[in-house]
Amino acid sequence: STPEADDAYMALASNYGFSRIFTCLLSVDKSPEETVAEFSQFMDRAHGYGFTVAVDTNPRVFQHLGATATDISVFAKMGVDIIRLDGHLGDRQDIALTRNPYGIAVEFNASQMLSLDLLIERGAYRRNMCVCHNFYPQRFSGLSEKRFIEFSEHYFGMGLTQAAFVTSQQNNTFGPWPVYDGLPTCEDDRTRSIDLQARHLLATGLIDDIMIGNCFASEEELAALAAVDTTKVTFKVEFDSGVTEVEKNVLYQFNHVTRGDASEYYLRSSVPRMFEYSTSIPARERT
């Protein structure tokens, strides 16, 4: 990418209400001085558009930049808001990192089963902690639904803010690596429309922040994401050719709530039972 392309993308995303950026230091091979200068300029532009910026790191990145768990002044100099630990530094170091004097949040890898509750018991600063899932560049490498829920429920129980990724379906998108099969967290989301991916993550009730793993998403995709109702589970409906007006009224007239005993196959709402209808719904032949 180029600074000009990045700037145009940030301006567009900002107009649609997006407020968070994820960027990566794992594959940066420039000198520490060049890295600090380049990322400082990027952070300044991102902050100008109102974005909070997270940078992906690991112990090698810390070593390359001359940072330690007790001295992250280089990240503060760059203007980093969130340090994501793709690989953590060790329990004592992680605890110290959460108590840094700059107020930089520490984001742990949610696609691993980490005992962050024990870190908190030992003195980690919960208010300065959050978690973010990985994204996966190759087909069939993403998390299964079962694993995603297992990891996410683990951290949800700790009260930590969680983030996950959806993927743009545009051609020739990219991420930290030159791969073109998308960058979602969940494998089942890889080929879905971007708004359906987001609605899926929101429907789990476990994810707070949703980011696009690859770039550049189209304006149509940004608009579709911005239009997603984050307050409820939403579906797009395809009507049967013989649908009646009574059925449409049942569907749209009520704010439906799923029953607690709903099956694995569909959600059930009992709300329409509270109202009487003078017109019956004709039986259909089973196919």
Model-derived regions: residue spans:
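Active-site mouth loops of central-metabolism enzymes
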Residues: 1-7, 55-66, 180-192
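N-terminal active-site wall of soluble small-molecule enzyme domains
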Residues: 35-81, 92-94
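Catalytic alpha/beta core domains of metabolic enzymes, predominantly
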Residues: 109-243
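Catalytic beta/alpha-barrel core
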Residues: 24-27, 32, 56-59, 79-91, ...
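Short, well-ordered coil/turn segments that N-cap beta-strands
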Residues: 17-19, 47-53, 79-81, 102-104, ...
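C-terminal functional modules
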Residues: 240-287
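Short, acidic/polar
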Residues: 2-15, 64-74, 117, 193-200
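Glycine-rich, proline-tolerant flexible connector loops at the mouths of alpha/beta enzymes
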Residues: 19-42
